[in-house]
UniProtKB/Swiss-Prot annotation, chain B:
Binding site for Zn(2+): 51, 54, 70, 73
One Gene Ontology biological process: fatty acid biosynthetic process
Pathway: Lipid metabolism; malonyl-CoA biosynthesis; malonyl-CoA from acetyl-CoA: step 1/1
Protein's name according to its UniProt entry: Acetyl-coenzyme A carboxylase carboxyl transferase subunit beta, chloroplastic
HAMAP family recorded: AcetylCoA_CT_beta (MF_01395)
GO molecular function, one term: zinc ion binding
Gene that produces this protein: accD
PANTHER family referenced in this protein's UniProt entry, alphabetically: ACETYL-COENZYME A CARBOXYLASE CARBOXYL TRANSFERASE SUBUNIT BETA, CHLOROPLASTIC (PTHR42995:SF5)
Function: Component of the acetyl coenzyme A carboxylase (ACC) complex. Biotin carboxylase (BC) catalyzes the carboxylation of biotin on its carrier protein (BCCP) and then the CO(2) group is transferred by the transcarboxylase to acetyl-CoA to form malonyl-CoA.
ZnF bounds (C4-type): 51-73
Amino acid sequence: MASAVLPQSNSLTSAKCSLVSPSRNSNLNKVGVEASGEFLRLQSSKNGVNQSLHFGLVLRVGQEDGRGCRKPRKTTAMLKKGGRKTPDKEYPWPQKMKPEDLMGSPLRFLSRFKPLPQKPKPVHLPFELPLVDIQKKIQEVRELANSTGMDFSIQLNELQEKYDEVRRDLYSQLSPVQRLSVARHPNRPTCLDHVLNITDKWLELHGDRAGYDDPAIITGIGQIEGMSFMFIGHQKGRNTKENIYRNFAMPTPNGYRKALRMMQHAAHHGFPILTFVDTPGAYAGIQAEERGQGEAIARNLREMFGLRVPIITTVIGEGGSGGALAIGCCDKMLMLENSVYYVASPEACAAILWKTAAAAPQATEALKITAHELVKLDVVDEIIPEPLGGAHSDPLTTSMNMKTVIMKHMRELLKMEPDPLLAQRVAKFRKIGSYQEGVKVDPRFKRNMKPRDAPMEMGEPKLLPSHVHQNLELSLKTASTAATTSE
Amino acid sequence: MVMSVINWFEDRQKFGGLIGAFLEEATRSSMTNERDRRISVNANKGLWARCDNCGNMLYVKFLKQNRSVCEECGYHLSMSSMERIELLIDPNTWIPLDEDMSARDILSFSDEDSYETRILLSQEKTGLTDAVQTGIGYLNGTLIALGVMDFHFMGGSMGSVVGEKITRLIEYATQRLLPLVLICASGGARMQEGTLSLMQMAKISSVLQLYQVQNKLLYISVLTYPTTGGVTASFGMLGDIIIAEPKAYIAFAGKRVIEQTLRQKIPDGFQAAESLFDNGLLDLIVPRNLLKGVLSEISGLYLSVPYNKN
């Protein structure tokens, strides 16, 4: 161990040592110095930890422990060598796999979405209070029966019947405000819950290949009835911890770009696309704005009308405005019975139009956001019924209902050629909107609109009957004649 | 001339209201153009406007001549849609489309006032049937399809009428192979029409798919103060070339929404055009007096492509 005074070492190291402050120099003399090539290694006599001296800068300054020796702070290098091991990133496959595990499909080991260890606590919505009361009474009577041993079965049956009747009454006539609270229920099944229920095989794919894998959007390939589909959806969390990880299903621009990449990939290979909408809206944050949240949504909207595969969108929870529409431009729009689709959340709408957030119930009624109202407005094609009590009371039945309706529409769409399919998609959205024209307008109402000042030679601009509809009719005609001739 | 009018204005304070009234009458009769009078009366109920940026007092007549740009600091004040059409379209070449289309209260929406009442009041107050004017005209000799949104009508909100008029304009441009210029100014989607307004975003994007991607025609979007919400998230950001006016406020989520989500103050100039330009979201920032020339030069560049074999 050379206890050399540093300035005496060779020119290379001395040049670097001169950068060290004089106050530390005195301390450095007390520790061993081992010059090795490019940089010096200071070895403390105590416990063999290296403190490398890169170009004269001491990287770690330890505290003096009284004897003049510097005590190094614990570095991660040290942890890895001796003591406590840093935990490895948790993988979804078991650490030790038994040979039986490898027999079935290996895909199930790749999914990080495992069933929750504990069943979620039941949450009762405000309008379900009568049910809670009856449930409590049933519980009391049962306890009484157990403790006294007397037979209370008649009362129990009566109470149970009453419970079922009240439940049926409540859930068959839900108001829009009540449906909104069911759509936002914390235990409502999420996108992945439904996907794992309806698919036989599931492979989740990740990343936008441009910097981030947004956990708020789920993409992957699944197989139903022997056919592979591309699944894309917003994923909410099942508890608070998951919700924070998933950002409450509010995607960033990276999420939309991931969805677009997957949709273009699906169109390239021929996977029909099934999307699931369940988001309060796109994430409103500083970085989201800087990375182009508006542009990401706009690009998705435009590109979805050019994808040459069938697209079916199902709204499974709340559909929040542009953030939902960015994966919702489809051939068929389906909604679960208790889901909602709005242009602005009722709270935001109330704050802007009624000037107070307390008017949210009135806004909910006025905006017409529930599934039944949207079917009347010709926005939604079909409603998927939910079991009594909402989707959260029986997720499996909800998923099976959804599967039936989706496959029914998919079978129809799979028969179509790409060009008529695209034309039909454009036509579906082309007819949405309500306006009036041909009614004479008071000239005062047009005084700030520039009237025509072009000469008559320029002609009258006549829009030829929308070529969209022309192409659609033409393609449908050719498709039907082709079908008849092939038979 | 300007100095003496300013002196008059100051003296008016000294002499009281009656002479002030006389002053307005005197200058009003000197204005020959019918339109000028209406606009000057509409603007701040007087002949003077204040620049939002430097606080300078600006004589409205000269302000209009200078295309609503403050002489002192160059700040672009808001401009009505009629003025924008006159800024861009060659005189005596404008043909409007769908002038008589107006909104319908499909949801029977009623907050403090019913939607129907609001429409009539806005139409009366602004002299516009809805928040957009569409039509075709010559721009420096090239026939273009032009749509101009107006922030004065219900905050430029996009409803079924805006969606339908712009869609028809794009369909017309697709059929006649015209370049398209859309000038955007909007506060977002029209909440009174609910989910129908949302679907207008998809509707316009679908015809843009046919126009831009399938027919490979040129679409230039010009973003002005302010462009927010549904318009930014649909056709505003889909231009082949995106131009913004200096210091325009361009956002997806409004400032207040972001502050509520993050619970922190937003830095100034966060959603200004210059900031978006630095983040790579815009192609150009063009001042108003150069806009017409720049648009015609761009369309000239795109028309003279030599390898049009695809």
